[in-house]
């Protein structure tokens, strides 16, 4: 018989996998994995804002991550720095500022390891509600913008020429990334949330023949990562968040055999 805390963790993990699957595919297609890292690092500033102002942590993380995302999009247009330099600048600067602020708040106790790596086994009913309702909103918005977003991924200039306003949908997509980071911070932490986005999508890309297959397999990969990771953490007493990411890595490694078979068939 599973304990209540484990069932809650499963419900949260399943909800996350359903959302990170489609989002992760778009991240992989658009080569935005480091962009996700930047938003995740900036989330630490949102955490400190939550502690200092006593507002909801998910809300403060969402606000800060969204601001950083929009600043980054603006800087990409107005500076000559390459995107990877801007990403590194904002990622490490925001992380450093967040850690400095934590150091200055000597009267407030922080679970820094929990913030960085998460603790999905400590979630409560409110977290389940947040993940499922927040995730549903993210998926609805993603469904609405999916066609122009996908078109701009394939050919940005053509999408712009057809009046699809790709920059507008890029901004909306980055805000969706900020939203999934905000609702997932307690579960897998700041440093591992990008793994939930990238690993299932990367695995799915290896075994898929078209974009829709990739989305479906990415969701399945995320669900398997959650199930394998959580049960493994329960059996061998390992941290739950890192165990989920490790399970995703193992699935990715297994998917490489499909690439090898494709290569052999082509030869």
Residues covered by each model-derived region:
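Transmembrane alpha-helical segments in multi-pass inner-membrane proteins
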Residues: 193-242
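Alpha-helical transmembrane segments in multi-pass membrane proteins
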Residues: 12-20, 42, 46, 50, ...
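Membrane-interfacial amphipathic/re-entrant helices at transmembrane-helix boundaries
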Residues: 1-18, 267
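Short loop segments and helix-boundary regions at transmembrane helix junctions
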Residues: 25-108, 204-216, 233-235, 259-261
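Loop-to-transmembrane alpha-helix initiation sites
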Residues: 9-12, 57-65, 84, 88, ...
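Transmembrane helix-bundle core of multi-pass membrane transporters
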Residues: 7-8, 77-79, 87-147
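Cytosolic-side transmembrane-helix boundaries in multi-pass membrane proteins
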Residues: 241-245, 249-267
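Membrane-helix/interface signature in polytopic inner-membrane proteins
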Residues: 140-173
């Amino acid at each position: 018989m599973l304990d209540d805390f484990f069932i809650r963790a499963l419900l949260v993990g399943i909800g996350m996998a359903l959302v990170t699957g489609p989002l992760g595919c778009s991240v992989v297609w658009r080569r935005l994995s480091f962009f996700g890292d930047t938003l995740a690092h900036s989330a630490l500033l949102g955490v400190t804002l939550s502690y200092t102002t006593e507002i909801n942590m998910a809300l403060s993380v969402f606000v800060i991550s969204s601001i950083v995302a929009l600043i980054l999009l603006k800087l990409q247009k107005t500076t000559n720095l390459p995107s990877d330099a801007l990403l590194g600048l904002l990622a490490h600067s925001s992380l450093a500022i967040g850690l400095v602020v934590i150091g200055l708040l000597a009267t407030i106790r922080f679970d820094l390891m929990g913030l960085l790596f998460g603790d999905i086994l400590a979630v409560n009913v409110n977290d389940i509600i947040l993940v499922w309702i927040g995730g549903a909103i993210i998926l609805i918005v993603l469904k609405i913008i999916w066609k122009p977003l996908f078109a701009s991924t394939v050919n940005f200039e053509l999408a712009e020429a057809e009046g699809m306003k790709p920059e507008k949908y890029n901004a909306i997509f980055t805000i969706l990334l900020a939203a999934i980071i905000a609702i997932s911070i307690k579960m897998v932490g700041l440093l591992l949330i990008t793994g939930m986005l990238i690993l299932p999508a990367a695995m799915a890309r290896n075994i898929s023949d078209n974009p829709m297959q990739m989305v479906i397999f990415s969701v399945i990969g995320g669900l398997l990562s959650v199930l394998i990771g959580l049960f493994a953490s329960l059996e061998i007493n390992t941290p739950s968040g890192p165990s989920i990411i490790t399970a995703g890595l193992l699935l990715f490694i297994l998917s490489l055999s499909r690439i090898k078979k494709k290569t052999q068939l082509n030869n």
